[in-house]
């Protein structure tokens, strides 16, 4: 998994950060660790060694710029070279809100294309545009049903042929007519292989029919550096591929290899799939991506994610907190907001110092604890939620029985509530909680067993 890559790279860089003296021998040792981490993530050996030479040359020959120590300069060199490995610049999906856009999704069967179609629709929806979906894959029996379920979940119109008696070209033609009121049409085409000439000819016909603004190739991140061959084959067959969407990065040990391989052939990666949910699609930003992997965090993305899921009740809760009111009702609302943000590992990776070295078990424990805390609060009366100080021995035992937990776990929740309340109290007084202080205490209590 990519968190394993992040952990290995962070451990390598920590040798620099924790060293009393940085010499050529230490630089070479750290570079060997970086090489091992990247090769284990299936990054091409030649790319790794070329990058290593550049890191070594700059680390030994370059003087640190003003304001940076030697250690900081070497860490920055590694960061810059890793970013370069993944393509450096952000490739944005450009859509003109004043006219209808068409996106054609292509890729090999099993790459996650149908799920990606729904994720892309959700992404566009969050940008304030109205997406529509066309299910043009008549070859895979479950394709229409899968896209139907996903489209209903995100409230996006779908056109397709459940009977699978029409051709993909006819379905697309009818769908273009039916979806006149949407801003962006996303077409999920049949999965294919480069040797299937008939399917490639059909795709060309669909391309001519729809005149798409963008053709997005969906590639399975678990392929590792083999993704290069697949991307190149499609690029040669369909010369107008606009961009790449790499899926399944959350569960692949070869994700780094897939990303670097695609970047190597200058095929712009615009999106990455980071989980199974419809909201788990991100615009690919090499700098933010490497920053999160190395444990430097990505506060911009964290804020964006928070804004995306903030509803009226969450905003009311924050208003109450800022006015000095923080009961278990406000805590419950905050836990609900965190739950909607996605996998805990992903959220914590956006917080500086939390991502690169955090064990997977700790993230899982955090997620489990959040769920259990909510179950415990569901067993409380409204009076108890508004006045947690009322929860003494008899009430505590009743709540524990109702939630199916031990009384000690209710005490753990109340301790967490107290810590969080104090932190918010300081925030209200203009003091920013530090990761090593109260904020660290909050995160540690969630992440580790007592």
Curated annotation (Swiss-Prot):
- This protein's gene is called srp54
Q: How does it assemble?
A: Part of the signal recognition particle protein translocation system, which is composed of SRP and FtsY. Archaeal SRP consists of a 7S RNA molecule of 300 nucleotides and two protein subunits: SRP54 and SRP19.
Record-listed GTP binding positions: 107-114, 188-192, 247-250
Role noted for this protein? Involved in targeting and insertion of nascent membrane proteins into the cytoplasmic membrane. Binds to the hydrophobic signal sequence of the ribosome-nascent chain (RNC) as it emerges from the ribosomes. The SRP-RNC complex is then targeted to the cytoplasmic membrane where it interacts with the SRP receptor FtsY.
Q: Name one GO molecular function term.
A: GTP binding
Species per Swiss-Prot/TrEMBL record = Methanococcus maripaludis (strain C6 / ATCC BAA-1332)
Top-level taxon in the UniProt lineage? Archaea
Q: Is Hydrolase there in the keyword field? A: yes
Class of enzymatic activity (EC top level): hydrolase
- Give compartment(s): Cytoplasm
Q: What is known of its domains?
A: Composed of three domains: the N-terminal N domain, which is responsible for interactions with the ribosome, the central G domain, which binds GTP, and the C-terminal M domain, which binds the RNA and the signal sequence of the RNC.
Stated family: Belongs to the GTP-binding SRP family. SRP54 subfamily.
* Name recorded for this polypeptide: Signal recognition particle 54 kDa protein
One Pfam match, given by its short name, reads SRP54_N
What the entry lists under InterPro entries is as follows: AAA+_ATPase, P-loop_NTPase, Signal_recog_part_SRP54_M_sf, Signal_recog_particl_SRP54_hlx, Signal_recog_particle_SRP54_M, SRP/SRP_N, SRP54, SRP54_GTPase_dom
> What HAMAP family is this protein classified in?
SRP54 (MF_00306)
The EC number(s) given in the record are 3.6.5.4
């Amino acid at each position: 998994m990519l968190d394993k890559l992040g952990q290995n790279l962070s451990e390598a860089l920590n040798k620099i950060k924790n060293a009393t003296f940085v010499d050529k021998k230490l630089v070479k040792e750290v570079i060997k660790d970086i090489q091992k981490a990247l090769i284990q993530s299936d990054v091409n050996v030649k790319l790794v060694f070329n990058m290593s030479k550049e890191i070594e040359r700059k680390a030994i020959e370059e003087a640190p710029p003003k304001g940076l120590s030697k250690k900081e300069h070497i860490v920055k060199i590694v960061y810059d070279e890793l970013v370069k490995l993944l393509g450096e610049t952000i490739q944005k999906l450009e859509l003109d809100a004043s006219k209808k856009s068409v996106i054609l999704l292509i890729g090999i069967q099993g790459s996650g294309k149908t799920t990606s179609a729904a994720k892309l629709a959700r992404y566009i929806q969050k940008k304030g545009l109205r997406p529509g979906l066309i299910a043009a894959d008549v070859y895979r029996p479950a394709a229409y049903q899968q896209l139907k379920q996903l489209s209903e979940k995100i409230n996006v119109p779908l056109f397709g042929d459940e009977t699978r008696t029409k051709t993909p070209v006819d379905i697309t033609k009818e769908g273009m007519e039916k979806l006149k009121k949407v801003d962006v049409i996303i077409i999920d085409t049949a999965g294919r292989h480069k040797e299937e000439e008939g399917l490639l000819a059909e795709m060309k016909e669909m391309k001519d029919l729809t005149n798409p603004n963008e053709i997005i190739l969906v590639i399975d991140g678990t392929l590792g550096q083999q993704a290069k061959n697949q991307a190149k084959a499609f690029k040669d067959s369909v010369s107008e591929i606009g961009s790449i969407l790499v899926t399944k990065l959350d569960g692949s040990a070869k994700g780094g290899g897939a990303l670097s391989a695609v970047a190597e052939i200058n095929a712009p990666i615009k999106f990455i799939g980071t989980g199974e949910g419809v909201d788990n699609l991100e615009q690919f930003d090499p700098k933010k991506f490497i920053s999160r992997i190395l444990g430097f965090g990505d506060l911009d993305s964290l804020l964006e994610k928070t804004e995306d899921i903030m509803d009226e009740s969450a905003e009311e809760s924050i208003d109450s907190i800022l006015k000095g009111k923080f009961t278990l009702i406000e805590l419950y609302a905050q836990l609900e907001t965190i739950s909607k943000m996605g996998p805990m590992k992903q959220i914590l990776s956006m917080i500086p110092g939390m991502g690169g070295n955090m064990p997977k078990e700790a993230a899982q424990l955090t997620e489990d604890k959040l769920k259990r805390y909510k179950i415990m609060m569901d067993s409380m009366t409204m009076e108890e939620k508004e006045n947690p100080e009322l929860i003494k021995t008899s009430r505590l035992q009743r709540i524990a029985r109702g939630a199916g937990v031990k009384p000690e776990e209710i005490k753990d929740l109340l301790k967490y509530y107290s810590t969080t309340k104090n932190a918010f109290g300081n925030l209200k007084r203009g003091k920013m909680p530090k990761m090593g202080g109260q904020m660290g205490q909050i995160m540690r209590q969630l992440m580790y067993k007592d």
